[in-house]
Amino acid sequence: MGKTAGEIYSEMEEYEDNLAIETLNRIYLDKVINPYRKSKKIIDMHTHTNYSDGDLSPQELIRLAIDKRIGTLAITDHDTIEGIKKVNRNEDIIVDSGIEIINGIELSAKTDKGRMHILGYGIDLNNKALNKKMIDLRDNSINSVLSIMEQIKRDYGIRFSYEDIKELVNANHNLGRPDLAKLCVKYGYATTYQDAFDKYLIDAHNKTRQTSKGLQYQECLELITNSGGIPVLAHPKSLELSEKEFLIILKEMISCGLKGIEVYHSSHSKEEMDYYLEIANQYGLLISGGSDFHGKSVQPDIELGTGKDKNIKIKKLSLLDKLHK
């Protein structure tokens, strides 16, 4: 079996000799990039890096996308654009492969139950209002995590050191429950991230979420639209609404500027995808889809590009057609 893009590129990084680097670059081009350019490619419009709650750096994510024969990749970190900014500055990009990278974000909206996330595609990363809001959301993420830490200390006697807290507050990414799950595993309070969520973090989050200073969905839609982006409702299944309730909120969101819906997602069954596709067509919404890939330690059963148990394989989306116009 041939080496992956990541393995070859890691070898290149170990060399300081220019000739060795040039040789490895040729190997990388021949063994990875050229076959990638000739291959039939798929689309993944929902991914996360370590700038939010993913495992991989933007560079590592793009390498993996090349290995997975992904032709279009949207980086949609939670409530931050720092990861995609790094890609756009070419500070964290590998040898040009022709892969298409879409500017994206996933904003969290306040909701009484379930989870409401709104994806934004094609956003202007230099938009002043967007960047100001990112600072506010960064501060909110710190306060939210500190509230959850206090809750699990009260409920379960779990305490983390001052150094752990200091490291979290000074991290270069928005904080979230996976950061706490990592600490729970580190100190033996849980065996896996999911174990930490099941034992402590879901309950603590539910107890503290009402004090959250999250955005209303109207503000999410406005923020994305005003930054030149296209707002899309992410994984609608996570709203945990009845069909009647879902259609009521969907119509309200459309009236406030919602333009698309994530039909294809790792958590959706075939029947659910068919239903959301019908809804998209009925209400004139753009169709999107993606794996919602976070990485192996966060979601070990979800693969980049193909989702859970290969339940998605996207080759065409009306959302992408709109972005290309």
What are these regions (language model features)?
Residues 110-136, 140, 186-206, 303-324:
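Active-site gating loops and adjacent loop-to-helix segments of metal-dependent hydrolytic enzymes
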Residues 1-114, 202-203, 215-298:
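An N-terminally biased module of ancient metal coordination in phosphate/nucleic-acid-related enzymes
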Residues 85, 146-154, 182-185, 222:
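A broadly conserved amphipathic alpha-helix scaffold signal in soluble, globular proteins
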